[in-house]
């Protein structure tokens, strides 16, 4: 590099970085989500950021996601050696685009070491070749849970997912939300009753999944492009627009099952949906938190049963803030055994970005510190260090100012970081084993004995 060449140190488009106040908010949300996941017995795992490409692409797992491939970048001398020898390198590898496909590979690798049903959570970054724009990222954190069984998996695990979603979003106080539930078998069975082919059904599900993005008129147009005739198209539109209370929709589906040509798939889907709804209610989730929405399809090919999407009421334009569903064949792809699973995912990076922009969430102070012990005189540093440790041992987060500056500047720096208290100890205070405690929020300053300082700070902390 030439001496005057400048390095472009800006972040690559679509790859976020966080200021301390933003990162602390993310950590708070991660901790809240983790506590709820663990309260239901989910256990943490970690999978590699890089997987073999054939794993990520198996059986159409990739969907519409653009995968980032990984190629080693060799030093110039090594590259020349490789070119000369004609080496082709190792198998193709890529960055994971979600947590679910790597979970399937993980279970295949550790099948005999795990206990089933296997309930895991993972809160990790994934990578997709999204078109970088506001609220969409190429690197983002997902907070996933999945339960995977061997041969069978109770539908009560499907019912448990809305209960978990409800606990998380009520705990973080983001306002009213609605969990929209459907079953892919209901959709598939309805399409079969219209004599739509299996290949067309997959396309129809993907098109319906975009209803809110592209609107009804474009959905009709896209369906007709797939060879769906106008009569079939209108029946599909009428079907996915069925609404009402949960019980109303279930009643309409049961009535429809009596008028449709015999469809085992449709009837099974309605039965599963009713079982899940009953379980959701038994878990104490209030009816205002969920509904049946027949337009919810989830575009990924591996979903086969229950599907979920969660939206914020009044902020529907933000899109889904938590989604997921049941899959029957994803894990079995790797081991040739039936291993049904169900899971949900919270796209946390995207969620934080959208909620901050909408003013629904606020960042936290940039430091976790609650107290600053200011530096009045360098020769009193042994006292400052001792007092700081006493405060920490009482469970407080403390910064000790090692550099002596004007007192006003030390107050300003503490206030800028959102720190509530400053402890002031000069020569006279040190000799008398006292301190001045300044509350930067209220401006109040009181004299406190050093022995009483930890409890006084905790008493006043807001």
UniProtKB/Swiss-Prot annotation:
Which domain of life does the UniProt lineage start with? Answer: Bacteria
**Matches recorded under InterPro entries:** aa-tRNA-synth_II (IPR006195), aa-tRNA-synth_II/BPL/LPL (IPR045864), Anticodon-bd (IPR004154), Anticodon-bd_dom_sf (IPR036621), His-tRNA-ligase (IPR015807), HisRS-like_core (IPR041715), HisRS/HisZ (IPR004516), HisRS_anticodon (IPR033656)
Q: Name one GO molecular function term.
A: ATP binding
- A Pfam family of the record is tRNA-synt_His
Instruction: State any GO BP term from the record.
Output: histidyl-tRNA aminoacylation
Q: Which UniProt keywords apply?
A: Aminoacyl-tRNA synthetase, ATP-binding, Cytoplasm, Ligase, Nucleotide-binding, Protein biosynthesis
Reactions accelerated catalytically: tRNA(His) + L-histidine + ATP = L-histidyl-tRNA(His) + AMP + diphosphate + H(+)
The EC number of this protein is 6.1.1.21
Q: Where in the cell is it found?
A: Cytoplasm
Transit peptide among keywords: no
* A GO CC annotation given for this chain: cytoplasm
Q: Where does it primarily localize?
A: cytoplasm
Family recorded in the similarity comment: Belongs to the class-II aminoacyl-tRNA synthetase family.
The UniProt subunit note reads as follows: Homodimer.
**Protein name according to UniProt:** Histidine--tRNA ligase
């Amino acid at each position: 590099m030439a001496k005057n060449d400048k390095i472009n140190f800006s972040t690559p488009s679509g790859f976020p970085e966080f200021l301390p106040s933003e990162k602390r908010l993310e950590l708070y949300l991660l901790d809240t989500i983790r506590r709820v996941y663990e309260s239901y017995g989910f256990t943490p795992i970690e999978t590699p950021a890089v997987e073999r490409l054939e794993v990520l692409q198996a059986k159409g797992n990739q969907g519409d996601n653009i995968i980032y491939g990984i190629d080693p970048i060799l030093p110039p001398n090594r590259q020349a050696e490789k070119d000369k020898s004609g080496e082709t390198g190792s198998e193709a590898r890529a960055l994971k685009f979600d947590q679910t496909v790597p979970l399937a590979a993980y279970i295949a690798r550790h099948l005999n070491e795990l206990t089933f049903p296997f309930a895991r959570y993972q809160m990790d970054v994934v990578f997709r070749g999204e078109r970088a724009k506001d609220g969409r990222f190429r690197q983002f954190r997902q907070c996933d849970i999945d339960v995977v069984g061997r041969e069978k998996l109770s539908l009560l695990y499907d019912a448990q997912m809305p209960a978990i979603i409800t606990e998380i979003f009520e705990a973080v106080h983001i306002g009213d939300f609605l969990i929209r539930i459907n079953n892919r078998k209901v959709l598939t069975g309805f399409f079969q009753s219209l004599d739509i082919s299996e290949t067309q059904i997959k396309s129809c599900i993907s098109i319906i999944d975009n209803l809110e993005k592209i609107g009804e008129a474009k959905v009709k147009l896209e369906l007709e492009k797939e060879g769906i005739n106008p009569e079939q198209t209108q029946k599909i539109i009428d079907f996915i627009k069925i609404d009402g209370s949960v019980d109303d929709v279930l009643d309409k589906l049961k009535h429809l099952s009596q008028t449709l040509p015999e469809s085992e798939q449709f009837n099974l889907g309605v039965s599963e949906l009713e079982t899940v709804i009953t379980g959701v209610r038994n878990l104490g989730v209030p009816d205002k938190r969920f509904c049946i929405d027949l337009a919810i399809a989830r575009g990924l090919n591996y979903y086969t049963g229950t599907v979920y999407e969660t939206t914020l009421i009044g902020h529907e334009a933000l899109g889904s803030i938590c989604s997921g569903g049941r899959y029957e064949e994803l894990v079995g792809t790797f081991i040739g055994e039936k291993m049904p699973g169900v899971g949900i995912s919270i796209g946390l990076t995207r969620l934080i970005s959208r909620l901050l922009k909408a003013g629904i969430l606020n960042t936290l102070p940039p430091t976790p510190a609650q107290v600053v012990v200011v530096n009045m005189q360098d020769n009193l540093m042994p006292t400052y260090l001792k007092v700081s440790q006493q405060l920490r041992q009482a469970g407080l987060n403390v910064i000790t100012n090692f550099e002596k500056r004007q007192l006003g500047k030390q107050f300003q720096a503490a206030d800028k970081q959102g720190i509530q208290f400053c402890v002031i100890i000069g020569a006279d205070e040190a000799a008398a084993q006292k301190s001045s405690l300044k509350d930067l929020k209220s401006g109040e300053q009181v004299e406190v004995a050093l022995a009483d300082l930890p409890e006084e700070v905790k008493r006043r902390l807001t």
